[in-house]
Amino acid sequence: LMEAMQKGKEQGLKCVIFTFDIPPKAIHKDTYNVLSTNEEKAHIFAEAGVDYLIECPFTDDFRQLSPYAFLQMLKEKINVKMIVAGTDFHFGYQRAGSFRELQQYADDLGYEAVIVKKKQYKGEDISSTRIRKEIAEGNMEEANYLLGYSYFLTGPGLHGNEIGRTIGIPTANQRPEEFKLLPPKGVYAVEILAEGKQYDGISNVGCKPTIEGVNPMGVETFLFDYSGNLYGKDIKVSFLK
């Protein structure tokens, strides 16, 4: 992303992120995990200074585009001048296109192909698979280093039984989107962005242990030095460790 933004700035081009409304692998899987929801991706890109975000519906017709047809579509629809991608980039029907095809078709379609080598950490490639593994094992500090930011969850505050408020500790309950990857059940140190202000706190990931009965997985966050009502308000919880 930073490479694309830097290259665009050097040549006076707008930085456009092209993504899909659902992960392509979701077509064939009933269960899958995402690091960021569509809303969270938009937040990340906006903070980074991306000019435009295109969220394309991943339809059957689109899925069957050949690598060349996919690149041709980008040229015709948004007049792409430069495409920045990693060495593990795949595109087109059945992921038939790679960075090699991206370079091969560049002259014919009139764009510049920029290929970025994967970065490594502790002798291994930094990848979404590796980051998912760290989060799934609860290694939040390691995951955050690989991400370059603190892994976070966004969503509105939901009504609970208000037990925290009765003991003087304001809490915010959140129900993540179905496929959002959560760390294992447990308690985590977090930072909370609420009503435009930053707060420290702790989050419990699990089946809301302060509430009796069986509940779906959720996140219950205790905010330090906060007084107010977060029900229905957008909250960002960043997991630190």
List PLM regions with ranges.
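Short glycine/serine/threonine/alanine-rich loop segments
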Residues: 11-13, 50, 111, 149, ...
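Short secondary-structure boundary segments
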Residues: 57, 87, 205-207
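Short amphipathic alpha-helical segment that frequently serves as the phosphate-/nucleotide-binding helix
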Residues: 1-2, 218
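Core alpha/beta nucleotide-donor-binding catalytic domains of modification enzymes
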Residues: 2-78
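A structural signal for isolated positions on well-ordered beta-strands in alpha/beta enzyme cores
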Residues: 14-16, 52, 82, 114, ...
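Classical nucleotidyltransferase
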Residues: 64-170, 193
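Phosphate/ribose-recognition catalytic cores of enzymes acting on nucleotide-derived substrates
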Residues: 160-241
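Conserved beta-strand termini and adjacent loop/short-helix elements that scaffold enzyme active sites
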Residues: 20, 56, 116-118, 160, ...
